[in-house]
Each structure stands twice: as structure tokens, then as C-alpha cells.
Amino acid sequence: RSCIDTIPKSRCTAFQCKHSMKYRLSFCRKTCGTC
């Protein structure tokens, strides 16, 4: 899978992942460009 930076790293928090993005934390980290 390619990693796409969909949200700013500053907003990549556990809360964002669990409540806004509906993804697991590991996937949220990938979408924040930390792959």
C-alpha cells in the first residue's frame, strides 16, 4: 500500500483515529505520512 498524507501530523492523534477517521491507530499514522 502506498502511504498518502491525508491530514496534518499535528492532527494525527489517537482521538482523531478512533473518533474521526474510524481507522486503527497504525493506519492513521500511515495516512499522516509516517511510513
Swiss-Prot record:
One of its GO terms (molecular function) is potassium channel regulator activity. The record marks 7, 9, 11, 20-21, 23, 27 as: Important residue for binding Kv1.3/KCNA3. Residues 3-35 form the ShKT domain. Changing residue 11 to Q: 7.5- to 42-fold decrease in potency of inhibition of Kv1.3/KCNA3. Changing residue 16 to K: 6.6-fold increase in selectivity for Kv1.3/KCNA3 over Kv1.1/KCNA1, which is marked by a 2.6-fold and 117-fold decrease in potency of inhibition of Kv1.3/KCNA3 and Kv1.1/KCNA1, respectively. Changing residue 22 to Q/R: More than 25-fold decrease in potency of inhibition of Kv1.3/KCNA3. Changing residue 9 to Q: 10-fold decrease in potency of inhibition of Kv1.3/KCNA3. Keywords: Antibiotic, Antimicrobial, Disulfide bond, Ion channel impairing toxin, Nematocyst, Neurotoxin, Pharmaceutical, Potassium channel impairing toxin, Secreted, Toxin, Voltage-gated potassium channel impairing toxin. Disulfide bonds join 3-35, 12-28, 17-32. GO terms for biological process: defense response to bacterium. Transmembrane segments: none annotated. InterPro entries: ShKT_dom (IPR003582). It is found in: Secreted; Nematocyst. GO terms for cellular component: extracellular region; nematocyst. Changing residue 23 to Q/R: More than 25-fold decrease in potency of inhibition of Kv1.3/KCNA3. The record marks 22 as: Key residue for binding both Kv1.2/KCNA2 and Kv1.3/KCNA3 (occludes the channel pore like a cork in a bottle). Peptide with both antimicrobial and neurotoxin activities. Inhibits voltage-dependent potassium channels. Potently blocks Kv1.1/KCNA1 (IC(50)=6.7-87 pM) and Kv1.3/KCNA3 (IC(50)=10-250 pM). Less potently blocks Kv1.4/KCNA4 (IC(50)=0.31 nM), and Kv1.6/KCNA6 (IC(50)=0.16 nM). Shows moderate activity on Kv1.2/KCNA2 (IC(50)=9 nM), Kv1.7/KCNA7 (IC(50)=11.5 nM), and KCa3.1/KCNN4 (Kd=0.03-30 nM). Blocks Kv channels by binding to a shallow vestibule at the outer entrance to the ion conduction pathway and occluding the entrance to the pore. Negative results: does not show or very weak activity on Kv1.5/KCNA5, Kv3.1/KCNC1, and Kv3.4/KCNC4 (IC(50)>100 nM). Belongs to the sea anemone type 1 potassium channel toxin family. Type 1a subfamily. This is Kappa-stichotoxin-She3a. It comes from Stichodactyla helianthus. The lineage of its organism: Eukaryota, Metazoa, Cnidaria, Anthozoa, Hexacorallia.
